[in-house]
Structure formats: structure tokens, C-alpha cells
Amino acid sequence: MDSVDRSSEPKYECLLFDMDDTLYSLSSGLNLACRKNIEEYMLQNLGINENEVPKMCLDLYKEYGTTMAGLKALGYEFDNDEFHQYIHGRLPYEKLKPDPFLRSLLLSMPQRKIIFTNADKAHVANVLARLGLEDCFEGVICFETLNPPVEFTEENSYGFEFLTSDIQVEPKRLSSLVDENFDICESSKISLPKLPILCKPSVEAFEAAIQIANVNPKKTIFFDDSARNIAAAKTAGLHTVLVGGLVVVQGADVALTSIHNMREALPEIWLSEEEKEEEQAELLYPATPIETFVLA
């Protein structure tokens, strides 16, 4: 059998990207608008006391990863699609502008590229369309992927595929970030969360995403703006990049102030192992300039 030279191949095989506040800046205002819509939904549709809503909204987000997951865990009953439509349907998407620089950067990457987000598929489609990034990703792992409704079909008209799954995630020891949110059934291979929604920063959500995307976590980089998500991703075995931060938090291998800085901070995405070694050698042993004489 002929041996295969792996030195000319990139170090990484897949790049997983969070979407909101990662592919675009927090300063867009969508995050704040989304929070206001959630608070309004809690007040108008769930009858929660107005004075309790702001703190409750934030506390549930911190505890469960999303306010929606927290509300479900507390026993509030509502339709998932209706909730997403209320929260995202009125967002000021016009504040998002095409990002040709990021588009060029993404298209230049030789690896598979997949979105991994807690958001629903309609929101994903709107955001990627506004940013002009519809054809930059192979697929999307979204809310419906990890929490499939009775009827969930792939949508291919967007230029990317919404990934689906019927896998069962085997339980592993969860990080301290999410231990308190899960019941592990000893008699079964299936891990059943107390909350009826599977989402980041659950380590199981990352394990599910790894299986759905069919990737090797040791050869996959995960980009996210959330320190909790980064910590969970590291527990799941992924390489991690915190986006929008100046400090390398626990679990982060690299911190970027902006997603636009990927090439400077992570040249190995574009370089093969052989090219990276050559570049490092040049830095360690720069060529010595030779003085030449010109006779005229």
C-alpha cells in the first residue's frame, strides 16, 4: 500500500462557528433587541410579573444557556416556533450589512465550515443572507437540529443545508458548568436533561454536534463569543477560539478581538504542517543579508 504524505495537508479538517455576536459585532444591537423581545414575550404571553422579568430573563440565560430553555425547565408551556417568531421576527436585521472581507476570508479556508448555533433556522437564514455569507458554509446545526419537531425537513433553498439527526448521545461526565442541569440515567445510554431543550453550553450538545457533523474534535476549531460555550467545547475535545475578547478565558486556546483577525491569529488554518514548519524556521533563522558591490 502506498504511504500517504500528510505533511501537505492542513492541520485542521473542520471549523465550527457560532453565529450571533461571533460572525458580526455585538455593537449591531441585535442582541439587545432580542433580549427586549424575550422580556416582552415573558410579560405579555407568559404572564410573568413585570418587576421580575429582567432579572429572571438574565438568570435563566446564565443557568440554562438560553432563556427559552430555562422557561421550559420551569414548566412554562409555549410553542417553540411561536416563541422564535416573536423573538426574531421583529429584529432589526437591516442593521446587519454585507461583510465582503469575512466572506473572502471564509471562502479562502480549505476546511469544511459549519454553523453551530442555538438559534432557529429562520433566524440563521436571515442573518447569513444579510451578511452575504449564505454560500460560505457546508451546513448548519441549529435549534431544530438538536430539538427536532415532529416534522423537520432540510431546507436547501438557502444555499446551505440544515443538518438533521436521529442520533442518541451517550452520557459522559459533564463539566461543572452544566452538571446541575442534567439527570444521568444509569440504566440507559441516553442522557436525559432536566430541561427539555438541548443547547449550548451543554457538553452533550457539543458531543451531539460533533457526531452530527461527523468531525474529529482533535482536528476541529470552534469559534464562539461565549466563555461558557468555549469551556464546554474544550471539555468536548475541540480546539477553541474566543471571539470578541481580549483575554484568553478558561478553555480558550486563542482570543480574537474580531472574527476578521483569524488569518493573523490562526495562520495554521491556511498552512499545511510542512509550510508551518518552514515559516517557523524562517522566524528562528532569518536569512543573513549579503552585501554586494556594484562596479560602475
Regions found by a protein language model. Name each.
Residues 34, 38, 42, 116, ...:
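Conserved short hydrophobic patches within well-ordered secondary structure
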Residues 99-103, 203:
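Structural motif corresponding to alpha-helix initiation and N-cap regions
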Residues 2-17, 22-100, 111, 120-122:
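N-terminal helical cap/lid subdomain that shapes the substrate entry/recognition surface
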Residues 1-12, 107, 121-296:
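Asp-based, Mg2+/Mn2+-dependent phosphohydrolase catalytic module
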Residues 43, 73, 92, 114, ...:
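Short, flexible active-site loop motifs that bind/organize anionic cofactors or intermediates
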Residues 29, 93-97, 115, 193-201:
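Short, surface-exposed alpha-helical recognition segments that flank or form part
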